[in-house]
């Protein structure tokens, strides 16, 4: 397992610099266009993507799904892998809360949902969520770091409410 992580880190170190855009305006306007990286959504943890579509944005995560019981969303979704998952959100992008020469502190809110399909049999997972996010949009690099509060309602494999849920994203913008 350790060798796999070493190869993954080497591959990431070689690929990420090739993906970083060389256009000057991409460094100063990280909220335009398309962002790609890693993150979590409603039930999904994996590859995160965000497409700006004014006045808002579509955000999605494709990755793995996990849960511990039939009580819906919760911290158990990060404990183990049960299958594959897709999370989709629509976010309303709001004006910056603060601006510095290094980053803009932006915020958004919206609604989303997620579907998880177990790979070893069992009941799929379905949940809906509200999203309220803080975005650190860096102005010297085409990066964003987003932290989201994400209260969710699990619909399958059982109805449950997760009022304390947080997710995060780290993306490169193109």
Task: Locate the predicted segments by residue.
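A membrane-pore/channel beta-structure motif
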Residues: 25-35, 65, 103-105, 128, ...
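Short glycine/proline- and aromatic-enriched beta-strand/turn motifs that initiate or cap beta-hairpins
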Residues: 20-77, 85-86, 173
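Cleavable N-terminal export/targeting peptides
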Residues: 1-29
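Gram-negative (and chloroplast) outer-membrane scaffold detector with strong preference
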Residues: 52-143
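Residues that define the transmembrane beta-barrel architecture of outer-membrane proteins
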Residues: 30-32, 41-45, 80-86, 105, ...
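Predominantly the C-terminal beta-signal and adjacent terminal strand-loop region
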Residues: 67-70, 139-174
């Amino acid at each position: 397992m350790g060798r796999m992580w070493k190869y993954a880190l080497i591959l990431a170190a070689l690929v990420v610099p090739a993906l970083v855009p060389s256009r000057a305006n991409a460094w100063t306007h990280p909220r335009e266009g398309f962002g790609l990286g890693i993150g979590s959504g409603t039930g999904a943890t994996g590859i995160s993507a965000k497409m700006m579509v004014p006045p808002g944005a579509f955000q999605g995560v494709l990755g793995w799904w996990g849960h511990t019981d039939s009580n819906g969303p919760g911290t158990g979704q990060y404990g183990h892998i049960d299958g594959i998952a897709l999370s989709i959100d629509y976010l309303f992008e709001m004006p910056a809360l603060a601006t510095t020469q290094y980053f803009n502190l932006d915020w958004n809110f919206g609604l989303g949902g997620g579907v998880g399909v177990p790979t070893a049999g069992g009941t799929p997972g379905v949940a809906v969520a509200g999203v309220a996010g803080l975005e650190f949009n860096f102005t010297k690099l085409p990066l964003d770091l987003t932290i989201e509060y994400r209260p969710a309602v699990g619909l399958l494999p059982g109805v449950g409410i997760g009022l304390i849920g947080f997710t995060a994203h780290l993306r490169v913008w193109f």
